[in-house]
């Protein structure tokens, strides 16, 4: 068969196969055009998940009749001239409108501010009609009907109406985060109306609209710069995490992207604070010279290529970690909200037909606990593993004469210990409940990691070495990492076939189950990624040791020990979550407590 030139319609349909994969792809291209035209209000209407109808209305600059005629031609654009190294707009290829027109029924109505009347044009399955006069408001209305009617095979690959409508909503959410000064509305017969009023320069307010107010309450601001690149945005505290990565948003020069480099950098930044299988919530915006990033590497423009990827990755990881460190001991507020929802006041209401006897102190079987007296059952001496945090310098929080807590202590003053596992502390604004094991585990981990940067962790020799019987493979794996264990204060050596002798353990862990620790380390080494760097391996081992050497559940603590733990939490970055990403404390505001009792 001889080589021949394809028809313009077929060329556009081929391009549509790459650019317009589904209704959400068309919505993205049309919204980008509206934003490039300077719109401050964009309305999206859909039916049938965008397959039956997709209409995008904006109040942008509009087009003249001459520009409108060119707009539906392939590779006609006003956004670039003769180079791809200085792209400052969302669109630039001039492919979207002709591609959509080749597979759907496309109509465009537009008017510029200086024109007396508007202009309209239609393209049906690649066949273009002439430009005609039409009444119109300033701006542009692009209406797409019967998407893919000209290529019915594509319809077989469409998802359900609900799924396609949800994909369009997600496109609008990403655009809304990137452009807080623009009002977005999505409506239609296939959905509930979604509206994002403009928030001006308040980017966090727009993020609260899109991600919910929980994100606003649990976000830490990011603003960092390295060489030619600047990173801004917000990152959620580690305990505010999700079961998927759908709430990780990245933007490069205002363009929404789903770039693997950026997403992997986010994961790396949270690697030590979020458990496996959970994902952080973050909104990051990177601004840099357009010449330093190539946005023309993907048909949908969802991926980019940085000239210096190492710079971008380092900037993201460093900025997020610095922000989390600045966040200090913050834990997610959603824990307290979940606890509030678990209460069901109606279950405690008195039955109306049953007379209630008047309450008196004499007839009540309960007695209020006096917090000015030592609680019965507290240990007389601190646990060895806790002595580092129960020093005289870390004295209990003092209270003012009226009983209020000194504002210098955000986590308040310890008032009681519940079930020998939870510390209850009174704060200025309510109360805090601390998981003593999770909190101390994090403190020990941070102490070990800090010690590693300057010197090996101090060790304590066992009077009698502990012999641990293991499989030969486990012994080999443990001895292969003996040097790393030694830096962490754990000294092991071979003790004949199938046995390991533990001679020293980390001093800061006090008395501990050395045999249990060695067995757990052997199990974890069997599943370890050997490609991990030394720093990553040491952190992982330190986390395991910290778990074994922390204050255990069921251990009674004295008031000074509890207060010392609270003070150390306040002074330790990242103490709001344990090494597994779970919260170490939950805070209840006084207003929350009053709501539980029906107080206004």
UniProtKB/Swiss-Prot annotation:
InterPro entries: DNA_mismatch_repair_CS, DNA_mismatch_repair_MutL, DNA_mismatch_S5_2-like, HATPase_C_sf, MutL/Mlh/PMS, MutL/Mlh/Pms-like, MutL_C, MutL_C_dimsub. Keywords: DNA damage, DNA repair. GO terms for molecular function: ATP binding; ATP hydrolysis activity; ATP-dependent DNA damage sensor activity; mismatched DNA binding. GO terms for cellular component: mismatch repair complex. CDD domains: HATPase_MutL-MLH-PMS-like, MutL_Trans. SMART domains: DNA_mis_repair, MutL_C. GO terms for biological process: mismatch repair. This protein is involved in the repair of mismatches in DNA. It is required for dam-dependent methyl-directed DNA mismatch repair. May act as a 'molecular matchmaker', a protein that promotes the formation of a stable complex between two or more DNA-binding proteins in an ATP-dependent manner without itself being part of a final effector complex. PANTHER family: DNA MISMATCH REPAIR PROTEIN MLH, PMS, MUTL, DNA MISMATCH REPAIR PROTEIN MLH1. Belongs to the DNA mismatch repair MutL/HexB family. This is DNA mismatch repair protein MutL. It comes from Sinorhizobium fredii (strain NBRC 101917 / NGR234). The gene is mutL.
């Amino acid at each position: 068969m001889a080589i021949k030139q394809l028809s313009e319609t077929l060329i556009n349909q081929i391009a549509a196969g790459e650019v317009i994969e589904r209704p959400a792809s068309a919505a993205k291209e049309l919204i980008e055009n509206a934003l490039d035209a300077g719109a401050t209000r964009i309305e999206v209407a859909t039916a049938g998940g965008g397959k039956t109808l997709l209409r995008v209305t904006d109040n942008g600059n509009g087009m003249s009749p001459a520009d409108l005629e060119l707009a539906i031609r392939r590779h006609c654009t006003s956004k670039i001239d003769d180079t791809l190294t200085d792209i400052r707009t969302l669109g630039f290829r001039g492919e979207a409108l002709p591609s959509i027109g080749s597979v759907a029924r496309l109509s465009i109505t537009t008017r510029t501010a200086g024109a007396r009347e508007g202009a309209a044009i239609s393209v049906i399955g690649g066949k273009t009609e002439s430009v005609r006069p039409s009444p119109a408001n300033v701006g542009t209305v692009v209406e797409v009907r019967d998407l893919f009617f000209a290529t019915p095979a594509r319809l077989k690959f469409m998802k359900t109406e609900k799924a396609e409508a949800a994909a369009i909503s997600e496109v609008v959410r990403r655009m809304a985060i990137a452009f807080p000064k623009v009002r977005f509305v999505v409506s239609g017969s296939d959905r509930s109306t979604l509206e994002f009023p403009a928030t001006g320069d308040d980017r966090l307010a727009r993020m609260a609209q899109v991600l919910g107010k929980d994100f606003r309450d649990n976000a830490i601001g990011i603003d960092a710069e390295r060489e030619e690149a600047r990173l801004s945005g917000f990152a959620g505290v580690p305990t505010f995490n999700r079961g998927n990565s759908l709430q990780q948003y990245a933007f490069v020069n205002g363009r929404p992207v789903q770039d693997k480099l950026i997403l992997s950098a986010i994961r790396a930044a949270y690697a030590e604070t979020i458990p496996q299988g959970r994902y952080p919530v973050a909104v990051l915006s990177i601004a840099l010279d357009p010449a330093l990033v190539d946005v023309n590497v993907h048909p949908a423009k969802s991926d980019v290529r940085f000239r210096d990827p190492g710079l971008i990755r380092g900037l993201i990881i460093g900025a997020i970690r610095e922000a989390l460190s600045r966040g200090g001991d913050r834990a997610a507020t959603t824990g307290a909200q979940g606890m509030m929802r678990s209460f069901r006041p109606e279950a405690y209401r008195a039955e109306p037909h049953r007379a209630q006897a008047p309450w008196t102190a004499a007839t009540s079987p309960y007695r209020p606990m006096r917090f000015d007296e030592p609680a019965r059952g507290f240990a007389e001496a601190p646990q060895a593993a806790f002595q580092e945090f129960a020093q005289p310098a870390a004295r209990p929080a003092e209270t003012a004469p009226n009983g209020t807590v000194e504002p210098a202590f955000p986590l308040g003053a310890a008032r009681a210990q519940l079930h020998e596992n939870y510390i209850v502390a009174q704060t200025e604004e309510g109360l805090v409940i601390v998981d003593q094991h999770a909190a101390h585990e994090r403190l020990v981990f941070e102490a070990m990691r800090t010690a590693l940067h300057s010197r090996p962790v101090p060790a304590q020799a066992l009077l009698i070495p502990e012999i641990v019987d293991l499989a030969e493979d486990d012994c080999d794996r443990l001895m292969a990492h003996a040097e790393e264990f030694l830096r962490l204060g754990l000294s092991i050596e071979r003790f004949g076939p199938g046995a390991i002798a533990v001679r020293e353990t980390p001093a800061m862990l006090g008395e501990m189950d050395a045999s249990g620790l060695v067995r757990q380390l052997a199990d974890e080494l069997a599943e370890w990624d050997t490609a991990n760097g030394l720093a990553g391996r040491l952190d992982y081992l330190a986390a395991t040791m910290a778990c074994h050497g922390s204050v255990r559940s069921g251990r009674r603590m004295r008031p000074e020990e509890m207060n010392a733990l609270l003070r150390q939490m306040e002074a330790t970055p990242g103490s709001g979550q344990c090494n597994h990403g779970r919260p170490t404390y939950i805070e209840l505001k006084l207003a929350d407590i009053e709501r539980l009792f029906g107080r206004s």
